[in-house]
Amino acid sequence: MQRLWAPVTLRRVLLLRSVYLPHSWAMQEPRLAVLSPRYFSCTNAIRAKEAHKTSTEEQEEVPLNPPQSLAGTEGLYKADSEPVPHNKGDIDPLQDKSIGIFQRFKKTFKQYGKVMVPVHIVTSTVWFGSFYYAAMKGVNLVPFLEFIGLPDWIVGILRDSQGGYALTAYAMYKLATPARYTVTMGGTSLSVQYLRKHGYLSTPPPVKEFLQDKMEETRELLTEKMEETKERFSEKMEETKELLSERMEETKERFSETKDKFSEKLQETKDKMSFRKKAD
């Protein structure tokens, strides 16, 4: 209440002083009264409170950004409502735009090699024939190679070569590799769609399921091989055991025969010795 009524009280005091004091002093006093510390204490407190409230609202509206010291961890500060990206292994290489053309070309060759090889042969033949025709019409590739800044020894090979149109066509063929791969990928995609539409090519399962099926097949094959190996080993063990038992029986029989013969010989020797003693 004192802070709210302080300006009014000061104005009354100034009016009373203006009546009793000279006019010049009364004109200067309001400035001092207006700049009194109590008046500014009230307004400054209100302004500071409003400024703090405004800064708090601005901080709430500013989106959460990662600090500079944690560069590369932007994913930790994003909202949890973002869709979970699909596994790259499940994406068809013909539809995967997140990788380069050369990686897509390799993956497509691994998955659709039977379709891609004929398409690539046809497109490469068309490309090389077009470049050979352009070379016959007088297209000179040397200024372009010098313009893009290739080494002099490479440019010199093409300039001083006796290969003629074929070498020029081959150089243009190699320079157009990204475009050739792109055309091959497009032709392969159209061919795959056509073959699937007419039932000549089945839709491949996702890579995860494909790998799981392959793992199951491999596991079954390994189990069968292990069972066959166990059976063979057990059969071999039985055969070996039978052979050993037969050998042992034969050895016992031979040993018994040898023992009988030895006992007979010993008995004969004893009889002869006893007969000689009696004769003496």
UniProtKB/Swiss-Prot annotation:
Region ranges (Disordered): 245-280
Protein name listed in UniProt: Uncharacterized protein C18orf19 homolog B
Pfam families, A to Z: FAM210A-B_dom
Membrane-spanning intervals of the chain: 115-135
PANTHER family (UniProt xref): PROTEIN FAM210A (PTHR21377:SF1), PROTEIN FAM210B, MITOCHONDRIAL (PTHR21377)
Any one of the GO CC terms: mitochondrion
Cell compartment(s), UniProt: Membrane
Stretches of the chain forming a coiled coil according to its record: 207-274
Organism: Danio rerio (Zebrafish)
UniProt topology in membrane: Single-pass membrane protein
SUPFAM superfamilies: Apolipoprotein A-I
InterPro entries (UniProt xref): FAM210A/B-like (IPR045866), FAM210A/B-like_dom (IPR009688)
Keywords for the protein's UniProt record, in alphabetical order: Coiled coil, Membrane, Transmembrane, Transmembrane helix
All copies of domain DUF1279, residue ranges: 96-208
